[in-house]
Amino acid sequence: MKKLGLIILVLGSVLLIQANSSKYTEDSKLSETLFSLGFTKPNHFINYSTEQVEQGKELVYEGRTIGPDGKQSRFISKYYNCLSCHNTVKEDPNPAVSDPEARLDYAIQNDIPFLQATTFRGIVSRESFYNGDYEKKYGDLVEPARNNLREAIQLCAVQCAQGRKLESWELEAILAYFWTIDYTLAELNLSDDELFQLNYASERGRERQAIDLLRTKYLKASPATFVSAPQNLKKGYEAKGSSSRGKEIFERSCLHCHEPDGVSSASFHTDFSFDFLERTFYKNKSISFYSLIRNGTYAMPGHRPYMPNYSKERLSDKQVEDLRAYIELKAQS
């Protein structure tokens, strides 16, 4: 019995030492882990300074910053900043799956916006941008942006935000900030066993095995499927809406832009707004509420800011009906 107890004690000590000396922990960054395992660095990899990170964060949050000349830079856009459409935190409970229902639950639990565009969290570890049907909206402009994060950022600044092209130092500063908000291994939901496997494979020269494991834990591209408004506007989509979930969508998505002093000129914060919104469900198909959600709007002479559309991965048919159920409930009450 004494020998058995000694063996258990020794084994426990070995496991404890291994756990305490693990190269990769829950706090390890995804990209840094992959690179240390021999994964090829992407063309948007940079070595950056603390000053660049601060500049990049201000550009993302405020739209301008103090430039290399010590002066305040011009706004990238006079209509929007990056946070008008993007989060900077984890927004999917499982980063390997694009599920709008799960994302809404996660947004409610973590009190974050529910937006049209994918989060910047982990963007440096993605390999493709403006995916799927985005070419239907932006045409050939998406081609140089598909496999180039710098070009994707420029397209977003000039077209989506209806702003100006970024200067080189601004672009590199934004990239610097993006590298600091890559996923941690904890955010990829690695189990204790998988984290052990990762370290075990690394220590024994099985880097490819470790890389393959990590790359199953997140999407390398955000899918984007554009869908049409329902044929019968009065009937809507087949799914039955939930007004309680519609309330969450309205407050976390619609009011993100359409609140008082928001980025949109249209404000929907009063009870009278719901009467107006309810009527738009039955309007001409090209300008109905459904059409605005599924197609968005376009920049026009004299009115350049426009509303981005919601792909089915960002707002499901069911969630559109949830939103309708809430609007109708408020309009009728």
Residue spans of the language-model regions?
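Sec-dependent N-terminal signal peptides
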Residues: 4-12
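Secretory-pathway/luminal and periplasmic proteins that interact with or process carbohydrate-rich
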Residues: 66-68, 89-96, 181-188, 333
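Ser/Thr/Pro-rich, low-complexity mucin-like regions
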Residues: 167-189
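Axial heme c-ligation environment in periplasmic c-type cytochrome domains
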Residues: 38-43, 68-76, 120-174, 269-275, ...
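Electrostatic cytochrome c docking/interface patches
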Residues: 32-75, 199-251, 265
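The canonical Cys-X-X-Cys-His
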Residues: 56, 79-90, 174, 178, ...
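Gly/Gly-Pro-rich "capping" loops immediately C-terminal to redox-active cysteine motifs
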Residues: 72-145, 259-292, 309
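Bacterial Sec-dependent signal peptides at the C-terminal "C-region" and cleavage site
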Residues: 13-24
